[in-house]
Amino acid sequence: MHDANIRVAIAGAGGRMGRQLIQAALALEGVQLGAALEREGSSLLGSDAGELAGAGKTGVTVQSSLDAVKDDFDVFIDFTRPEGTLNHLAFCRQHGKGMVIGTTGFDEAGKQAIRDAAADIAIVFAANFSVGVNVMLKLLEKAAKVMGDYTDIEIIEAHHRHKVDAPSGTALAMGEAIAHALDKDLKDCAVYSREGHTGERVPGTIGFATVRAGDIVGEHTAMFADIGERLEITHKASSRMTFANGAVRSALWLSGKESGLFDMRDVLDLNSL
């Protein structure tokens, strides 16, 4: 992997997130936009990636074939769908390319494929690339260790109407951070839905509630509720650029790393706190 001018390829270049990833790649010093990809048959194929993102002409045209651009990038940034990301993962593993994965909604087999690939290539895989969200995850660990055994814990998340997975990857990461701090497995204590006569709340569980409406970029709250008081830790995103900037920053951070599985907390060095 090159030590300077890390060349990135953007998957789903014509989507909302893809366009902002292009903008972020063009703006960050030390990063070069090397390739932009769209699905076969897209009307955007052949377009200039910079013009597509409203950033001016770059000379990088949108293509559908990874083979055609395999010599043009060092790190592949993917915020698409699980099935597409896994295809891209296999290609990157075969050709020794780093990856930044922001796709959510993987099943356990998909997550295992990412872990397996990290034996051969360097991957940053995170549910959320926002600096604020990752600071929040660290705060949740601290709060859970102090309050978790004595409070009812609920996670509430809201996103735009087009989001296809629920709960969000970030909400699940919040649950995992809390469960880990309490020496629990989230699979054993998560409650994802309540309907009808549910009975009283089961102590020690972590509840999840999901909202899908309008154009909400992303809102997440963790509630630690006791009798007479509750602590709420909330993050609200108002622009996808916060995720795009974090993803491109992660690609730059991968410079010089040959293999391994990392997350945004590694990029921000939060694990040392």
Curated annotation (Swiss-Prot):
Group of enzyme by EC: oxidoreductase
Pfam families tied to this protein: DapB_C, DapB_N
Binding site for (S)-2,3,4,5-tetrahydrodipicolinate: H160, G169, T170
Localisation per UniProt entry: Cytoplasm
UniProt GO MF annotations: 4-hydroxy-tetrahydrodipicolinate reductase; NAD binding; NADP binding; oxidoreductase activity, acting on CH or CH2 groups, NAD or NADP as acceptor
Residues annotated as binding NAD(+): G12, A13, G14, G15, R16, M17, E38, G102, T103, T104, A126, A127, N128, F129
Positions of NADP(+) binding: R39
InterPro entries with a match to the protein in the record: DapB_C (IPR022663), DapB_N (IPR000846), DapB_N_CS (IPR022664), DHDPR_bac (IPR023940), NAD(P)-bd_dom_sf (IPR036291)
Major localisation: cytoplasm
Domain of life of the native organism: Bacteria
Classification via HAMAP family: DapB
Protein name: 4-hydroxy-tetrahydrodipicolinate reductase
Species name: Escherichia coli O139:H28 (strain E24377A / ETEC)
Gene that encodes the chain: dapB
